[in-house]
Amino acid sequence: MTVIMLSPSNGWAISLDKVAQAIQPGKTKYLVINEPYNPAGTLMSQQTQQELIALAKKHSIIIMSDEVYRLLEHDSNDRLPAMADVYCQGISCVTMSKPWGGCGITIGWLAFPDVSLKQKLIDVQYFGTACPSRASELQAMMVLRASDHILDKNLTIVRHNKTLLKQFMHTYADLFSWTEPTAGAVAFIKFKGPMTSEQLGEQLAMQNISIKPAYCFSDEVTDETDCFRVGFGEEKMPKALAALGAFVEHHKENWRLAMRERRRRKSKL
């Protein structure tokens, strides 16, 4: 398996050149993507999606597209077509947990136009579970009957909380940076201060503030090591953001002093 790491340096964009280089003709069978991208909440363009499909089609590669944050685009005009709708060997993976907020239902589904894949996927399912919970199926049906109402409500929360998060990022632009998310309810924020995201997470945990440091997503040391994920899809997020802001206010001058000292040392090298 070849993993292609995305980078904040280009806004977490998929490099088609790297994908092409990773393909081993005749050996590569699947391309697995995460779109919208978790943890950064970014989206590829429709042109990139079409070029990716053309590349996969050239080598007869199945694209498995994790679309669990689809339908939570902050602007509906940015929404990409489901992979299953635009590629003959595309598979779209969806769950109840993200756009509908049905985390406890533990129900999801795969959509694909190639019926020859059906039995293969059913066989794979049996490695994890013999059958889904009937109670979860009934709950999922109830939620989906009210889908439009639930999505509208959740998007209202997401958009409001994102506005607050943007204000936070503007206020502390010298301490934090990001690629502004355009879909989903998560953002991947870079901490510019004098510690790793893991160390920051440990300090925040002592104040009952939870973030997801970079090591939760990769054990490799990359240019995202200082990044951490935050969620902004819940009604209680403004309270959590206020607590984070109070923590930053308490420490910001010491951080800035350490950052100036670090820059001074680098300038002497």
Give the positions of each predicted feature:
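Helix C-cap/helix->beta junction micro-motif
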Residues: 58-59, 172, 207, 251
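Conserved core segment of the aminotransferase class I/II
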Residues: 85-159, 166, 255-257
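Conserved glycine-rich beta-strand-loop-beta hairpin in the small C-terminal domain of fold type I
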Residues: 141, 157-166, 177-190
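Conserved C-terminal alpha-helix-loop-beta "cap" of PLP-dependent enzymes
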Residues: 176-177, 189-229, 234
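PLP-dependent enzyme catalytic core of the Aspartate aminotransferase-like
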Residues: 206-207, 219-269
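Active-site phosphate-binding strand-loop segment of PLP-dependent enzymes
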Residues: 6-78
